[in-house]
Curated annotation (Swiss-Prot):
Protein's recorded name: Histone deacetylase 2
Organism lineage: Eukaryota, Metazoa, Chordata, Craniata, Vertebrata
Record-listed E.C. numbers: 3.5.1.98, 3.5.1.-
Subcellular location: Nucleus; Cytoplasm
InterPro entries with a match to the protein in the record: HDAC_PDAC (IPR050284), His_deacetylse (IPR000286), His_deacetylse_1 (IPR003084), His_deacetylse_dom (IPR023801), His_deacetylse_dom_sf (IPR037138), Ureohydrolase_dom_sf (IPR023696)
Length: 488
């Protein structure tokens, strides 16, 4: 067994594809996949690659994606391109694609890579081949069953959790993005197999969901936990509620696997955010979750001041590895992004913390009351385990041409789009997601509408769906390889 016992160092698998940074949402759009390349390059130059196994994720197939998403929606994502948008105007409106979630070159391939890393990480954890799996390209928590939302198209988190549920009776999902993890909560709102815990800004803010009183429904009642926060929360206030709540959740729910969404838009100075966390304060959440010694899938998410996203996820990779790294940044391909101080850690701003101790304590106690309503560790009848999404031969990297592996490192050095640096650093009009779209967020009616179909897909883990249309995208053994990069 790969699992480490006690508080010792953990085995960490890390998923990254060198092409991920080449995808471009468009000029002026705050979501920049380039930040994942920056993160990767920074952690390479800190030498962290020596301490973990690095894999290139397989491209998730349409068949994998329809384990949760509707066939029509995934077919649309496969078909839509910038040059044929006029043919799909009705579908674009239906699937909420166009403004916040634009059509860009390689859109479906981007979704395949993001999802592939998260699902492959879940499979590694299921096989007990690692203690922790990291996919900074994942964590796209707003995507719905048949709808894009909040810069997210395919919900890699839901798909990874469905994979974990094949082997784990109970999975805990924790979300520290500044935005409510609405897509994940919605997917599991009526089941006790998954508990969702979200710490987020609430109010006139995207997606407009995540009220304290949203606690789940049916079998899932009390299995959705929401901590609504106000502007300006700092490290001290966040730390005072995060550890007690997660500790109580662990005590009452007793999950056997954890998924942690590490959205970095909760950092101080984020282009779309309004919290005041430092990198250390954000990473404290990783430290807390890690102490419970459970299989852990760490994912990315939001984060729109990209120099700070790279700082944060690099440091959190080091935390996962129990590795101390210096505050002085090593020289890297994107060194100029980190000026003028060229340091790893950031300072909080002087913004007012509107989260008073009284408010935080009141919310904490309300959540404790809800958690006391849970039966200790609900029993689940486990069924025959279906086939893994990533096949056994996907770990065989030795057959891959070494030059092909090395070329991924070289591809990291491609020049970013001209607008990548300047767009991310000015505040501009990037807040459109939080103002114009918050009204679209409260769509709970969809839960009841899709309840039966969704429940069938997520709770019936007896076998894979054999009735799916054979004309869908096939899983190619080569295409689904999760190749380890021996020369990162």
């Amino acid at each position: 067994m790969a699992y480490s016992q006690g508080g010792g160092k953990k085995k960490v698998c890390y998923y990254y594809d060198g092409d991920i940074g080449n995808y471009y949402y468009g000029q002026g759009h705050p979501m920049k996949p380039h930040r994942i390349r920056m993160t990767h390059n920074l952690l390479l130059n800190y030498g962290l690659y020596r301490k973990m196994e690095i894999y290139r994720p397989h491209k998730a197939t349409a068949e994998e994606m329809t384990k949760y998403h509707s066939d029509e929606y995934i077919k649309f994502l496969r078909s839509i391109r910038p040059d044929n948008m006029s043919e799909y105007s009705k579908q674009m409106q239906r699937f909420n694609v166009g403004e916040d979630c634009p059509v860009f070159d390689g859109l479906f391939e981007f979704c395949q890579l993001s999802t592939g890393g998260s699902v492959a990480g879940a499979v590694k954890l299921n096989r007990q081949q690692t203690d922790m799996a990291v996919n900074w390209a994942g964590g796209l928590h707003h995507a719905k069953k048949s709808e894009a939302s909040g810069f997210c198209y395919v919900n890699d988190i839901v798909l990874a959790i469905l994979e974990l549920l094949k082997y784990h009776q109970r999975v805990l999902y924790i979300d520290i993005d500044i935005h409510h993890g609405d897509g994940v909560e919605e997917a599991f709102y009526t089941t006790d197999r998954v508990m969702t815990v979200s710490f987020h800004k609430y109010g006139e803010y995207f997606p407009g969901t995540g009220d304290l009183r949203d606690i789940g429904a049916g079998k899932g009642k009390y299995y959705a936990v929401n901590f609504p926060m106000r502007d300006g929360i700092d490290d001290e206030s966040y730390g005072q509620i995060f550890k007690p709540i997660i500790s109580k959740v662990m005590e009452m729910y007793q999950p056997s696997a954890v998924v942690l969404q590490c959205g970095a838009d909760s950092l101080s100075g984020d282009r779309l955010g309004c919290f005041n966390l430092t990198v250390k304060g954000h990473a404290k959440c990783v430290e807390v979750v890690k102490t419970f010694n459970l299989p852990l899938l760490m994912l990315g998410g939001g984060g729109y001041t990209i120099r700070n996203v790279a700082r944060c996820w690099t440091y959190e990779t080091a935390v996962a590895l129990d590795c101390e790294i210096p505050n002085e940044l090593p020289y890297n391909d994107y060194f100029e992004y980190f000026g003028p101080d060229f340091k790893l850690h950031i300072s909080p701003s002087n913004m007012t913390n509107q989260n008073t101790p009284e408010y935080m304590e009141k919310i904490k106690q309300r959540l404790f009351e809800n958690l006391r309503m849970l039966p200790h560790a609900p029993g689940v009848q486990m069924q025959a385990i279906p086939e893994d999404a990533v096949h056994e031969d996907s770990g065989d990297e030795d057959g891959e041409d070494p030059d092909k592996r090395i070329s991924i490192r070289a591809s990291d050095k491609r020049i970013a789009c001209d607008e990548e640096f300047s767009d991310s650093e000015d505040e501009g009009e990037g807040g459109r997601r939080n103002v114009a779209d918050h009204k679209k967020g409260a769509k709970k009616a969809r839960i009841e509408e899709d309840k039966k179909e969704t429940e069938d897909k997520k709770t019936d883990v007896k076998e894979e769906d054999k009735s799916k249309d054979n004309s869908g995208e096939k899983t190619d053994t080569k295409g689904t390889k999760s190749e380890q990069l021996s020369n990162p």
